[in-house]
Swiss-Prot record:
The keyword Cell membrane does not apply. Catalyzes the transfer of a dimethylallyl group onto the adenine at position 37 in tRNAs that read codons beginning with uridine, leading to the formation of N6-(dimethylallyl)adenosine (i(6)A). It is an enzyme of class 2 (transferase). This is tRNA dimethylallyltransferase. The keyword Nucleotide-binding applies. GO terms for molecular function: ATP binding; tRNA dimethylallyltransferase activity. Transmembrane segments: none annotated. Residues 36-39 are annotated as: Interaction with substrate tRNA.
Length: 294
């Protein structure tokens, strides 16, 4: 029987997913598939914390630099491409390793969502936030109106059911054919937020402002321009705010995004988180992965 095992590394921005993914790829004969919605764009290297050329030389990476700034990349595109790549990687006898923090991408792949190519990412996020804010009673009331015989009333299944009613197929056989091991990375909030702030300062020293200005001048309305680390500078380029304020916006929005990422993975997916500052990390991860693959 053909191996169908896939590793998935998730967690908030700046927690260390890239480093772990590369370590796993080296140790487990793996190839990395990026699960980041911004790293698909060519030339947006600094603000997306894209893997460097040196890092890419250590392990094979996929779905990096596959779109121009003016091109869109949807959840549907990701699921189609990721499934194709997983199949090819397994055929080569290697281990597919999904690494990224875009929760909607990861969940859609794992649960086999059939979202149309024209799906609206923003609408999906807004619906998710609305459903998460409901009480159990309110949530289950919505579900039972649509399906009085809904088999199991738990929040995760109820939310998924309502999203599928709105955005995709509810075919019970639409799940993925692969066996996924989810590895979640996290750190104490204060420490994580400090790492985020430091990363933004490092990005500034590496030329983030120039990268953002180029995007502002050439493709300000593109999907690529909506990412954190770019859009915050547009008011500065227009003379509306100071550079200092723009940098603080990047830091604030990055911290808020990290919080949303954690909320998504905790509420939507079966993830066991590893503290990246634990004495047993990363050996604890390698042990889990070895057991899973064997």
């Amino acid at each position: 029987m053909k191996n169908n095992k896939v590793l998935v590394v998730v967690g908030p921005t700046a927690v260390g997913k890239t480093a772990l993914g590369i370590d796993l790829a080296i140790k487990m004969n793996g190839e990395i598939i990026s699960g980041d919605s911004q790293q698909v764009y060519q030339g947006l290297d600094i603000g997306t914390a894209k893997v460097t050329k040196a890092e890419q030389a250590l392990a094979v990476h996929h779905l990096i630099d596959v779109r121009k700034w003016t091109e869109n990349f949807s959840v549907h595109d990701f699921v189609m491409e990721a499934n194709r790549l997983i199949e090819e990687i397994i055929e080569r006898g290697n281990v597919p390793i999904i690494v990224g923090g875009t929760g909607l991408y990861i969940q859609s792949l794992i649960e086999g969502y059939h979202l149309g190519g024209q799906e609206n990412h923003q609408a999906m996020m807004e619906l998710r936030e609305t459903l998460l804010a409901l009480t159990d009673e309110e949530l289950f009331e919505k579900v039972l109106k649509l399906n009085p015989n809904f088999p199991e009333l738990n929040r995760r299944r109820a939310i998924r059911f309502l999203e599928l009613q709105t955005f995709g197929s509810t075919d019970e056989n639409s799940g993925s054919d692969y066996n996924f091991l989810l590895i979640g990375l996290n750190a104490e909030r204060k420490v994580l937020y400090e790492r985020i702030n430091q990363r933004v300062e490092q990005m500034m020293s590496e030329g983030l402002l120039s990268e953002a200005r180029s995007l502002f001048e050439k493709a300000p309305d593109a999907q690529a321009a909506k990412g954190i680390g770019y859009k915050e500078f547009f008011p500065y380029f227009s003379g509306e705010i100071s550079l200092e304020d723009a940098v603080e916006l990047v830091k604030r929005n990055s911290r808020r995004y990290a919080k949303r990422q954690l909320t998504w993975f905790r509420n939507r997916m079966e993830v066991e988180f590893e503290d990246v500052f634990s004495e047993t990390y990363p050996d604890s991860v390698f042990e889990k992965v070895t057991q899973f693959l064997n």
